[in-house]
């Protein structure tokens, strides 16, 4: 059998060509299809892995962005409440001194302010009415420049008006000639007279009006010893005391 293949010329020719193909590469083995793989692509794919991990990590980082927004919102809300508290504190400071003994709640502050505003409006209306009456009296009964000499010659007391703002507060208005205000009844003396009647001084203001007149506006608070006295009667007594004091 072996002799048959050896003697067969076709078989010998095919074997010779196969051996030639095998050994024609000077000892090199035939190339394998696996050797055509591009290793650079594999390395590039591996280098992309951290980027993918970072992308995943950034996905989890969106939760951090939400936390940042929450912190910003909390800081904004804290500042807003602080500003509101400062505004309410300023509003409480405008209330009478009796309301400053303790820190009022926000609803109580608003309630007190809503009650206090009409009282102030009433006070302004009374002052405007008094001023109008004084101006009308000055222009009707006397000529400019004559009223001062008439008051000084006759020894007339200044015009005094006391008004109850509420159960605890009183506003006293005094009108007198400007050229005698400093000697007859200066503001400091007028305040001292009122304090001697059991009142606590809160604030005051002065202004000059028509007819060479000076106006005092004095805001006072009643003490505990004067609360039992009816406000209209108490105001009337204050007016008399101030007028009598101005005659000294």
From Swiss-Prot:
The keyword Nucleus applies. GO terms for biological process: ethylene-activated signaling pathway; positive regulation of DNA-templated transcription; positive regulation of siderophore biosynthetic process; regulation of DNA-templated transcription; regulation of ethylene-activated signaling pathway; response to arsenic-containing substance; response to cadmium ion; response to iron ion starvation. InterPro entries: bHLH_dom, HLH_DNA-bd_sf, MASH1/Ascl1a-like. A motif (Nuclear localization signal) lies at residues 68-75. Keywords: Activator, DNA-binding, Ethylene signaling pathway, Iron, Nucleus, Stress response, Transcription, Transcription regulation. Belongs to the bHLH protein family. This is Protein IRON-RELATED TRANSCRIPTION FACTOR 2. The gene is IRO2.
